[in-house]
Each structure stands twice: as structure tokens, then as C-alpha cells.
Amino acid sequence: VYAEANNAEDVKRLVSENKVAAIMFECVQGEGGVNPLTKEFVSELAEIAKKEDILLITDEVQTGNGRTGTLYAYMQYGIMPDIVTTAKGLGGGLPIGVAMLGEKAENVFSPGMHGSTFGGNPIASSGALSILKRIDDKLLDEVNQKSEFIKNELSGAKGIKSVTGLGLM
């Protein structure tokens, strides 16, 4: 089921009406623009997941790996998801995806339970390691500085109604 973005009451209603295993969300909605979720809403998602004992999963496929000014966008929201997924920025153009499991979900998979034809590709894995080695405080500061510059320049431009985003998204 899908809930309306930034509407915690809609999420609560859907959780109460359905058998829900997880709440999965993107901190920045990338369809129809670049629209960050509010910090209040994401905090409420975390509270609902904790209260209902369901998994909280953040999809960082577009937002992860420094694109938002932190390693992952959720880090700007003061929450800790049970599962984090990431892909695009991790591979630097190479096909790779990762799901990182926290304590609540760490025992879901054991060696041999999940396989992939392309899993463990040595070139993509080397590329991902190279990307991760390059993401440091200096790079993240640069992302934030460029983000502020772009937002300030666009905000004053003629014909611009609003500027949304997070970091360089």
C-alpha cells in the first residue's frame, strides 16, 4: 500500500487497516520533482514502526553515498532505519546495489539464502570500494557548499517559484 507523503495520519490509518511488515520510504521523493520529506514526518514514521514493531526501511538508491551532503540522507533526519538500500551513487556508473541490515533484521539472511547472477561482481565491487574511500568530510562539505550556492542563486532568479531538494538533489 502507498501512503501520502508527509501525512503521518495516512500512514497510521494504513498500518491499522492492513497487515504491514515494513514502512519503506525515500527521504527525497524523486518523482514529479525533488521533494524532501519533512523531518517531522520521518520522525513519525520511525515512531510508528517502533510502536507497531515493524521494519523501517529507507531507500537510498538515489540519495545515498554523499549526494545529499551526508553519507545517507536519513542521517539528516535523526533516525536509524532497520534496513538501508543503496545503489546508483555507490557504483559510479557500474551496476551494484546493497541492502544494509540493522540489529532488528540482521538474522533475516544467512550465507547461501540469497544469490544473484551478478552478485559479487569484482569490477563493480572494486568500483564501490573506490567510491566509498573517496567520500570523506571534505567531499561532504563541498556538496553542502555547492548546494547552498545553487539554492541561493536559484531562489533569487526570475520565474522561480520555489527551490526544493537536499544537498545536490
Segments predicted by a language model, with ranges:
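Conserved N-terminal phosphate-binding loop of PLP-dependent enzymes in the Aspartate aminotransferase
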Residues: 1-169
